[in-house]
Amino acid sequence: MKLICGLGNPGKEYEHTRHNVGFMLIDSYLGVEKMSEKFNGLFIQKIIDGEKVLFLKPQSYMNLSGNVVRPFVDYYKIDTEDILIIRDDLDLPLGRVRIKRDSSSGGDNGIKSIISTLGSQNFYQFKVGISNDKNRDTKDYVLGKFSKEEMKILDEVIGDSRSLIDAFIHGQIVSTTDRNYGEKK
């Protein structure tokens, strides 16, 4: 079984914020699907091309994501290399996507929490660049909404994320996948 977890913060006030890119990609992939609730997470189990896949959106705050991910991993007996965590990344430019396995937290507290509770960083991270506005407080920036121009770039990322998620499900993802969207041609 594969686990695909999108990180974000629960609640209407956080919808469409930079920190909720993980939720946005999960929602886009699934479309309008009713998710069940367990272990403080919204989840749905699907069979995609014969592969069992668990989609998860933790309903704790980002910094406590590991407390939600770990019970699902234990309950469903999921190997860490079968986990994909979708998250925002301040250190990547807006529109850059990077997928890496066995990577550190890079300062992301949600990933730190997951590494701590799993006792391993041997999982895939699907990092979506949101840039970093050094002129703004980091917390205010990541909890801020995307501008219309930024959303155009993010829409490209979201549109292509399905193929990257499918590649993970089918065991065809390359650990160093790196793509750019929204660049001037």
Model-assigned labels for residue ranges:
Residues 2-102, 112, 116, 120-126, ...:
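Nucleotide and nucleotide-moiety/phosphate-recognizing core
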